[in-house]
Amino acid sequence: LARSIITLTTDFGSADHLAGTMKGVILSINSDAEIADITHHVLPYDLLDGALAIGQAYKYFPAKTIHVVVVDPGVGTERRPLLVSAGTHYFVAPDNGVLSMVYEREEQLTVRHITSDHYFLQPLSTTFHGRDIFSPVAAWLSKTWQTNAFGEEITDFVRFTLPKPKPAGKGVKGVVLRADNFGNLLTNLAAEDLPQVIAGTSFKMRVGNVEISKFAQTFSEGGPNEPVLLMGSSGFFEVAVNRGNAAKVVSANRGTEVTVEFA
């Protein structure tokens, strides 16, 4: 029998016991579960960063993987815990929009409000639902696969959309979504937004106060401190600096406007 795979995506960091405690809860309920960390370094309380992390990773896991996502600034409030069936994957997360990229990409969605509290750890804390709700629900689901046992289906779940690129003059205007650990700047510009760049048409890109005109295939193509545009592994264009930090070189971060113009 194939082992159940449960992934964890949180903003807990790795210095504290929180992520380890969640694993203990899961293994106490299903000792055969295989637990994979996607990341515990989502920016604290940052729902967009969490949505990007899970949105870019989940498809690379086998069918029937259960993804636990805990970026939960509203823990202990009225926000609902959710169990989501999306395509061939399952997600256990708070109802705060952190699954928005999953909702955007999957047409087959069933979203349930988790109300069956006999699956929760008791006494239920008001501050650590990752331990008391999301982990045990994921573990029990991995044993039973009975999604309807956890609560009723809902349609009014919270979701947000990524900012969309807009036409601007002879080009396109976009925005930086995040800077990764290397300082690479992930934009909201996808291949279909800039087919001319991929085809080799000359362009001028402005990020903050810096102009970029080089489209690279690899990180190593730029010179020292030379920002280049490249197609990232996530399907979005990125600004990068060879062995350097593009976010620092161009003084940009999330929300910085990006414009690409063609002659």
Predicted segments with their positions:
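Anionic-ligand-binding alpha/beta catalytic cores of soluble enzymes and soluble regulatory domains
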Residues: L121-N188, D193-I198
